[in-house]
Design a protein with these regions (language model features):
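Electropositive polyanion-binding surfaces
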Residues: 16, 20-437, 462, 468, ...
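A structural connector/turn signal
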Residues: 8, 397, 454-456
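C-terminal, low-ordered peptide segments at domain boundaries
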Residues: 484-486
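Single conserved hydrophobic/aromatic residue that forms the stacking wall/gate
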Residues: 1-19, 488-489
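Short nucleic-acid-contacting surface segments enriched for D/E, G, S/T with interspersed K/R
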Residues: 401, 441-467
Length: 490
């Protein structure tokens, strides 16, 4: 590995190797990612299997990895105090958090320390506390990285990138695999600083591929469709908010709404509606930017252990550095997920663009389009599998709570009833419209509410209710609630 650079002043925070060095009027940020492509050769048996999976799949108690454990937890895990091969994105960032220059190169990493997010957050919150004293030799490094994070965050806010308030949860299981509790995920500055470092490295990767005019996969997130925009405008108007969105909105318009609604009791519901107006991000060789992050070009570089598109990006970057062209491996036989995702895109008017040109160039473009479709489809399949398992576990958990009463908030309104998320359990169930009393309720799609024709009683997103758990369908992954009449308010 004599051609590789060596980096020893670094530390490891659960998966990403980082080093922020203060320089005159800014920082030099190094993001080092395990060089999976060195071990997983194009077209090898491991590569074919990884391509077929396209992603790791995460369940509450188990992970189905994209790569064998000897790689993912061994040679490709950036463990402390051992040499590891990596790909480095080496960046110069000015005092305002703006990217000035970058370069990519293979390197050998020797990490000096591994931190958990909790440790880093504790040190940053109290640089003279017990955790900081125990890691005194690394405190300055963390402070520099935190200063850089704040500069990057400022640049992100000026760019107008979206940042919504939503509650993500995680299932904590006991030793028998049953749910012990469901708790909200807590994000602190340690999570955010690693996130910002990864975002800027991903942005550099996309720019590097574009500048080289080499085919590759981009992570594309398009703006809302006209139909969703109109629905969102009507919803905001119904709430009496003075803000709206234009026909060709910028991400900053959505972020302005998010900022203006901070502190409102229905802030999470408003932010949920903003998110629902968005399209899903996909992998495609046709770059059209990332709407949510407000990047003109974006891709995935930072997780080649668990995402095949990242592995492809590493290979493309290496090919560009070597002044070569990267040729895709044989695409696995398209399966059910591929066909399902193709139909979904076609229904939304986002079918993959037909290749233009002739001969090898057109064939290459078609191959990359097929790769993007395959990886996007398998990403959706993995997400759906994870949600299905979580739904089953939640149903199993709620069977032990039949007949019990809980408080909750309406999280979604449909023509057939209300979906309610329970306060303490973070479990969602349905109050069917027939459980709302003896009168007729009309669904108002604009206001996202059900309104009683006789009494005018309204149930909207954000309405607080008291419910009783009435039925659990384990096979159907459904939980039904019964409304405690007279115990709801907006």
């Amino acid at each position: 590995f004599s051609s590789r650079r060596r980096h020893t002043r670094s530390f490891h925070v659960t998966g990403v190797q980082t080093c922020a060095l203060p320089i005159c009027k800014g920082w030099r940020l190094l993001v080092a990612i395990a060089d999976v492509s060195h071990y997983v050769q194009t077209g090898s048996a491991i590569d074919i299997d990884a391509y077929d999976r396209a992603t790791s799949v995460y369940f509450p108690r188990r992970v189905i990895p994209m790569l064998p454990e000897k790689l993912s937890n061994g040679l490709c895990s950036l463990n402390p105090h051992v040499d590891r091969l990596c790909m480095v994105c080496d960046m110069l960032i000015d005092a305002q958090g703006e990217l000035e220059a970058y370069q990519f190169y293979p390197a050998v990493m020797h990490s000096h320390a591994r931190f958990t997010y909790t440790e880093v957050a504790a040190i940053l919150s109290n640089t003279r506390g017990p955790q900081a004293l125990a890691r005194a030799e690394r405190v300055d490094d963390l402070i520099h990285l935190h200063d850089l994070y704040r500069a990057l965050l400022g640049a992100r806010q000026r760019r107008g990138a979206m940042d919504f308030e939503t509650t993500e949860t995680q299932i904590v299981c006991d030793e028998n695999g049953r749910i012990d509790k469901i708790v909200p995920r807590v994000r602190n500055d340690a999570h955010r600083l690693i996130e910002e470092a990864m975002l800027i490295a991903n942005c550099c990767s996309a720019d590097f591929i574009l500048q080289a005019k080499h085919p590759g996969l981009f992570r594309v997130h398009e703006g809302p469709t006209p139909e969703k925009l109109e629905l969102l405008r009507s919803y905001l108007k119904a709430l009496g908010l003075p803000l709206t969105v234009s026909d060709d909105p910028a991400p900053s318009e959505f972020q302005a709404i998010a900022k203006a609604t901070e502190g409102r009791p229905d802030v999470q519901q408003i932010h949920t509606m903003l998110l629902r107006s968005m399209q899903q991000a996909i992998y495609t060789p046709i770059n059209s930017g990332h709407f949510g992050l407000a990047f003109e070009a974006y891709t995935h570089f930072t997780s080649p252990i668990r995402r095949y598109p990242d592995l492809l990006v590493h290979r493309v970057i290496k090919a560009i550095l070597a002044k070569k062209r990267y040729e895709l491996p044989q695409l696995p036989t398209p399966g059910e997920a591929h066909a399902k995702f193709s139909r979904r895109l076609a229904q939304r008017g986002r079918a993959p663009a037909a290749s233009t040109g002739k001969g090898k160039a057109a064939a290459t473009q078609s191959a990359w389009e097929a790769a993007g479709l395959h990886c996007s489809a398998n990403e959706r399949r993995a997400d759906e599998a994870s949600k299905d398992v979580e739904a089953w576990l939640k149903c199993k958990f709620m069977r032990d709570h039949l007949g019990e009463e809980y408080s909750g908030v309406v999280s979604s309104v449909t023509s057939f009833g209300l979906f309610v998320t329970l306060d303490s359990l973070y479990v969602e169930g349905l109050i069917h419209i027939t459980e709302l009393g003896g009168e007729y309720f009309r669904f108002d799609e604009v206001r996202q509410e059900l309104r009683g024709e006789r009494t005018g009683m309204r149930y909207a997103i954000g309405t607080r209710v008291r419910i009783q758990v009435s039925r659990v369908d384990l096979d159907g992954r459904k939980i039904d609630f019964r409304l405690e009449i007279g115990r709801a308010h907006v």
